A protein has these predicted regions:
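Flavin (primarily FAD) cofactor-binding/catalytic cores of flavoenzymes
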Residues: 1-232
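Short, flexible loop/turn segments with low-complexity composition
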Residues: 234-237
Length: 237
């Protein structure tokens, strides 16, 4: 392994808390190649690689501590943001996929340039991406990024109506809905909304790491089901 350096690790973690990924200034292909070498044990693990592996092992404990226990909005936002940022290390991609991507980059079939919400113009052969003074012509695009669970960006009529009427409210700006541990929605006035429950990505902030298989068949779903059964039995909302 690499040499232990507490100062370097603390500096890395501080940067990660403020702006995830800001520590990386290498070209994308260079960083990808280095990560592959770390995964194969050909290079000492970086602070990010080690931290990501720890977060991967801590996922169950993180859910067990976070999901059943309501957190202050600012605390929830900080923890969710930190966990989401580290997913580039803790959740993949698999080494084989990273190697395949590197081959495509080296052969000139994939351009790893990053663009943040560029303008997109259709052309006769595909699309033109425009961001500031940078333009790229592309023949194929793959939407591989899930949108953030930001209630303010939703345009679904059902959810929009519930939000506008105050029956669904965000736990914090940029995050998902405020819910109780059993999935029942909490409205703008702080009261539980009878007959309304929500689980999954749009509850991010009330729960954490909701995209995982853990939350499809895990404790969060169990608490919701137990709550529904109890209310049916007791004839409550």
């Amino acid at each position: 392994g690499g040499a232990a350096d507490a100062g370097a690790l603390n500096a890395w973690l501080s940067a990660e808390r403020e702006k995830p990924g800001s520590q990386e200034d290498r070209p994308a292909a260079t960083a990808l190649r280095a990560a592959i070498d770390e995964a194969h044990g050909r290079a000492p693990p970086s602070a990010g690689y080690v931290t990501g592996q720890l977060m991967r092992k801590w996922q169950n404990a993180l859910r067990q501590g976070f999901n059943p226990n309501p957190a202050a909005p600012a605390t929830a936002a900080a923890i969710v943001g930190f966990d989401d940022g580290l997913k580039r290390f803790s959740y993949g991609p698999p080494v084989a996929s990273a190697q395949e991507l590197l081959i495509l980059i080296q052969d000139g079939l994939v351009d790893p340039r990053a663009a943040h919400d560029p303008d997109i113009v259709m052309t006769g052969t595909g699309w033109r991406l425009v961001e500031h003074d940078t333009t790229a012509e592309v023949a194929a695009m793959v939407d591989a990024v899930l949108p953030p669970p930001d209630l303010g960006r939703l345009d679904d009529p059902l959810m929009r109506g519930l939000i506008d009427s105050g029956r669904v409210t965000a736990i914090e700006k940029g995050l998902g809905a405020r819910i109780r541990p059993d999935g029942r929605l909490i409205g703008r006035d702080g009261s539980v909304q009878p007959g309304l429950c929500l689980l999954g990505r749009l509850a991010m902030g009330s729960v954490i790491a909701a995209d995982s298989i853990h939350d499809c068949f895990g404790a969060a779903a169990d608490r919701w089901a137990q709550g529904v059964a109890a209310r049916v039995r007791d004839h409550t909302g």
